[in-house]
Amino acid sequence: MKKTYVIDTNVLIQAPYALECFEDNNLVIPLVVLEELDGMKKVDGDKGANARKAVRMLEQCRNRGNLLEGVALENGGLVRIEKNFVDVELPNDLPDSKSDNRILMVCKGLKDKGEEQIILVTKDIVLRLKAQIMGIRAEDFTAEQITDEDANYTGRTEAYIPEDIVKTFKKSGVICDDVYASDDDGVNHKISFVENEFVILKPDQSSKKTLLGRVKNGKIVPLEYKKSKPYGISPRNVGQYFIQEALMTGADKAPLVIIKGLAGTAKTFYSLAVGMEKVFNNPTGEYRRIIVCRPNAQFDDDIGFLPGSEQEKIAPLMRPIIDNLEQILDSDENKRYDDEIELADKIDEIFERGIIQTEALNFIRGRSIEKTYLIIDEAQNMTPNQVKGIITRAGKGTKIILLGDPNQIDKPFLDERTNGLSYAAKCMKGSKYCWQITMKQEECERSELATDAINRL
């Protein structure tokens, strides 16, 4: 039996292509949704851009038929605009002057009319609660939602390696079938590896020493940059060795790196350190510059209305980047700065020369950036559509680094399963162009107090 989905405005704003995601079912767009889209189409940023995309998609439908009667979609479904049910009664506490409540009126009207399987689709949790109170089935938009299996993928695994092939591994690597895992009962079994997955190998006759490798074309090969010290920084744990390998590898082999983890696991710090190494100390000129973006939930949509230049507008967001730069520059024992003023002058020089540039996320959209080391910090506050726009715009020689913690979401309508960082990790898993790693809680490099607080609070 076909279902009838009533679509809220926020679904189309987050995913303007959402009409394509409901198979052969019926879709209803309340008239108030059109009004809201019309009010948003001139807004700066992704909200306005997505509103315009959604409107254009509806216009294409209008050109094919009558939207009041219903227009067939390519997937076999039917979309229509609903202008009726203005007289449907709601509880006194739900005024019909509010857009959300007018959407509820459409849902209730369709249900009272006898249409079966009426489902409201909205990103708004409160609206879903109100719908349930009124006996209306409501769901989140799940087309971009990742599964438990996707969420649990960390980009790293452990395996045992026979002692007699350890030397072979160190020299040229071993095939994946040569290593194995062991369950709690001591039964050995093969492992299903993912391309570019990092591997901690334990020789089966000596569990004290471990070897670090990466899956490449059916083999597990040793890390190439294990002994590197980008801008004088040395790895302090296994996760940082894996981060270093992914970041130091050139954009021709690793154009996309995804690093997830708690605050304090050196995601941003290490990404900046490698970027500085590549731009300052690489004579081949691998990258022209470092660009850092840091999306913010309350900021991106309103940047056009804030006073000042672009850099003045985004300066508050970039303070954590400055903090990491100070730590990186002052960590070099051969170039230790005498005082804070000298260190600040050096950082100012780096920005003035354009070696590091900071950009608002909206200013990246639509550009094709070449030979750039592009860091997207706090990427969990991006939508899947935003991440797609960034990755698919990567120019030749550009390396994109997505950093963040899926459990620290600040943006409305996103959660740990629907944010852009998790979505990119799911979609790019297994791609030879994507390297990803999730840092462990014990790999947090903040103070002992901070580490203890993470465990206790």
Predicted features along the sequence, with ranges:
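N-terminal pre-P-loop "Q-motif" helix
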Residues: 232-255
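Conserved glycine(s) of the Walker
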Residues: 266-267
